[in-house]
């Protein structure tokens, strides 16, 4: 749902910023 999309985007952003992808 909506919360899943928000969490998914948040994880992608944190992944990109931390470089732990």
From Swiss-Prot:
GO terms for cellular component: extracellular region. It is found in: Secreted. The lineage of its organism: Eukaryota, Metazoa, Chordata, Craniata, Vertebrata. InterPro entries: Nigrocin. GO terms for biological process: defense response to fungus; defense response to Gram-negative bacterium; defense response to Gram-positive bacterium; hemolysis in another organism. This is Nigrocin-2JDb. Disulfide bonds join 15-21. Expressed by the skin glands. It comes from Odorrana jingdongensis. Has antibacterial activity against E.coli ATCC 25992 (MIC=15 uM), E.coli CIB 84492 (MIC=15 uM), S.aureus ATCC 25923 (MIC=8 uM) and S.aureus CIB 85462 (MIC=8 uM). Has antifungal activity against C.albicans (MIC=31 uM). Has hemolytic activity against rabbit erythrocytes. Belongs to the frog skin active peptide (FSAP) family. Brevinin subfamily. Keywords: Amphibian defense peptide, Antibiotic, Antimicrobial, Cytolysis, Disulfide bond, Fungicide, Hemolysis, Secreted.
């Amino acid at each position: 749902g909506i919360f899943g999309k928000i969490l998914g985007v948040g994880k992608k952003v944190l992944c990109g910023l931390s470089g732990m992808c």
